[in-house]
Amino acid sequence: MPKMKTNSAASKRAKITGTGKVKHVGSAMRHNLEHKSARKRRELSADDVLRGGQAKKLHQLLQK
């Protein structure tokens, strides 16, 4: 049976850390940043860690 392909869209958007957590870049940092405070921009710039069902689904898509 052939190998399963990794989902390309998921692999571009998420990464599995060494401990097995799923990390992805959050939203709200593309434009309209001038009205957000420096504190808010700093908080939003950090990568998010997915939990629960979303993490489980991405593990299946990335096959790890």
Curated annotation (Swiss-Prot):
It holds the Pfam family Ribosomal_L35p. The keyword Ribonucleoprotein applies. GO terms for biological process: translation. Residues 1-64 are annotated as: Disordered. SUPFAM superfamilies: L35p-like (SSF143034). GO terms for cellular component: ribonucleoprotein complex; ribosome. Residues 54-64 have a biased composition (Basic residues). Keywords: Ribonucleoprotein, Ribosomal protein. GO terms for molecular function: structural constituent of ribosome. Gene3D superfamilies: 4.10.410.60. Residues 1-10 have a biased composition (Polar residues). Belongs to the bacterial ribosomal protein bL35 family. This is Large ribosomal subunit protein bL35. It comes from Bifidobacterium longum (strain NCC 2705). The lineage of its organism: Bacteria, Bacillati, Actinomycetota, Actinomycetes, Bifidobacteriales.
